């Protein structure tokens, strides 16, 4: 029986597997946000890369281009809705300034810990699983 799986890759592995500066940075993120593995870091990094790529492409278009106006507003509204971008910063230029930490701050695990409902960032993950 032939099955076709409709799925796409949600992360991209690093080009250089043993780059010390990157490994240290990822380990710091994992510790700070209580992530389970490197794949969770790569997933957020990939999402950010896709959003920034779309913003860069839209910025190359003319200011009055209908595609830039329509898709740009949609992208900005989406980022404001998920809480990554402030409503005062609704410009494509601000999307390029986003960091991986902006996305990791919006995770439920981080929010539970920041609100003081959990004793540690790892405890927050346990509470969510219950």
Curated annotation (Swiss-Prot):
The keyword Acetylation applies. Its main location: cytoplasm. Keywords: Acetylation, Cytoplasm, Isopeptide bond, Nucleus, Ribonucleoprotein, Ribosomal protein, RNA-binding, rRNA-binding, Ubl conjugation. Residues 106-130 form the S4 RNA-binding domain. It is found in: Cytoplasm; Nucleus, Nucleolus. The modification N6-acetyllysine is found at residues 64, 114. Disulfide bonds: none annotated. It comes from the Eukaryota. One of its GO terms (cellular component) is small-subunit processome. PROSITE patterns: RIBOSOMAL_S4. GO terms for molecular function: rRNA binding; structural constituent of ribosome. GO terms for biological process: ribosomal small subunit biogenesis; translation. The keyword Cytoplasm applies. There is a cross-link at residue 91 (Glycyl lysine isopeptide (Lys-Gly) (interchain with G-Cter in SUMO2)). Component of the small ribosomal subunit. The ribosome is a large ribonucleoprotein complex responsible for the synthesis of proteins in the cell. Part of the small subunit (SSU) processome, first precursor of the small eukaryotic ribosomal subunit. During the assembly of the SSU processome in the nucleolus, many ribosome biogenesis factors, an RNA chaperone and ribosomal proteins associate with the nascent pre-rRNA and work in concert to generate RNA folding, modifications, rearrangements and cleavage as well as targeted degradation of pre-ribosomal RNA by the RNA exosome. Component of the small ribosomal subunit. Identified in a IGF2BP1-dependent mRNP granule complex containing untranslated mRNAs. Part of the small subunit (SSU) processome, composed of more than 70 proteins and the RNA chaperone small nucleolar RNA (snoRNA) U3. Belongs to the universal ribosomal protein uS4 family. This is Small ribosomal subunit protein uS4. It comes from Sus scrofa (Pig).
């Amino acid at each position: 029986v032939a099955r076709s799986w409709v799925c796409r890759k949600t992360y991209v592995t690093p080009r250089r597997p043993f780059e010390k500066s990157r490994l240290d940075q990822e380990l710091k993120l994992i510790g700070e946000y209580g992530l389970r593995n490197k794949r969770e870091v790569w997933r957020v990094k990939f999402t950010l890369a896709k959003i920034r790529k779309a913003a860069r492409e839209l910025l190359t278009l003319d200011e009055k281009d209908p595609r830039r106006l329509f898709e740009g507003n949609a992208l900005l509204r989406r980022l404001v809705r998920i809480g990554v971008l402030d409503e005062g910063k609704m410009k494509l230029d601000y999307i390029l300034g986003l960091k991986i930490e902006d996305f990791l701050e919006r995770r439920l695990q981080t929010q539970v810990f920041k609100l003081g409902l959990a004793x540690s960032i790892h405890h927050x993950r346990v509470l969510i699983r219950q």
